[in-house]
Amino acid sequence: FFFLPLAAAQATGAERDALQFNLIAGGIRAILLVGYMWLISCWSEIRRVFEYHGAEHKSIFTFEAGVDLTVEEARSFGRLHPRCGTSFLLIVVLLSIFLFAVADSLFADFVARPQTLLERFATHLSVLPLVSGLSFELLKLSGRKRNHPLTRLLIAPGLWLQRITTREPSDDQLEV
């Protein structure tokens, strides 16, 4: 998920244009993420895990609504939650495109040459904590402002992705 997209983008010859390079690498990263999630969702064992993931979201919604945490109450809530880790991963992938492009541009300005693949890998790895921290803050903000029309538009891709990583749980799973 990290080195392969960089190597693939490097192979396209886009290493001189930081934004183009990171759009290619980020696109590959997004395809790998969605493809991996879809592929593992085909396995029955993982499908069951995704049912528990849906139960977790229903439980969180029940708790946040301030109603009794019972199977009957939880059943009425949706399985797609705006502050899900699946959404977080998508935010990381998308935000990294732009923050990595900025880091690459600064590096190129500082050393006056394009980065090697290993230098780019090290640069991106060093910026990853910033990407993760900002992504987490955006995820928290999306939870607080989830009813705002712009927020609903921005969180939609993460909710769509959760259609892969969550399944409708059984009552036994909700009870856990």
Residue ranges and their predicted role:
Residues 4-15, 36-74, 104-109, 135-160:
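Juxtamembrane helix-loop transition segments at the membrane interface in multi-pass membrane proteins
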Residues 13-17, 21, 79-83, 111-123:
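Juxtamembrane/transmembrane-helix boundary motifs in multi-pass membrane proteins
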Residues 69-91:
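Loop-to-transmembrane boundary segments
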Residues 84, 98-115, 119, 174-176:
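Long hydrophobic alpha-helices with heptad-repeat/coiled-coil character
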